[in-house]
């Protein structure tokens, strides 16, 4: 049986990336709360470039 989670980086960035968060009011609220909490990474796309070496 095929599993439901089939990961793709493009889909991940498009749905949960920084630009997607900034596009909506609630997304900006998420970023603000993560900044207030002091999260190391605000969104998926902000951490995408740092992983590869």
Swiss-Prot record:
One term under GO cellular component: ribonucleoprotein complex
Alphabetized InterPro entries for the sequence: Ribosomal_bL34, Ribosomal_bL34_CS
Amino acid composition bias (Basic residues), ranges on this chain: 1-19, 26-40
One Gene Ontology term from the biological process aspect of the record: translation
A Pfam cross-reference name: Ribosomal_L34
Superkingdom, natural source: Bacteria
Single GO term (MF): structural constituent of ribosome
Alphabetized UniProt keyword annotations: Ribonucleoprotein, Ribosomal protein
Name assigned to this protein: Large ribosomal subunit protein bL34
The species this protein was found in: Prosthecochloris aestuarii (strain DSM 271 / SK 413)
Gene: rpmH
């Amino acid at each position: 049986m095929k599993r439901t989670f089939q990961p793709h980086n493009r889909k991940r960035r498009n749905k949960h990336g920084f630009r997607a968060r900034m596009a909506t009011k609630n997304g900006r609220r998420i970023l603000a709360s993560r900044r207030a909490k002091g999260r190391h990474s605000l969104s998926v796309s902000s951490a995408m470039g740092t992983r590869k070496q």
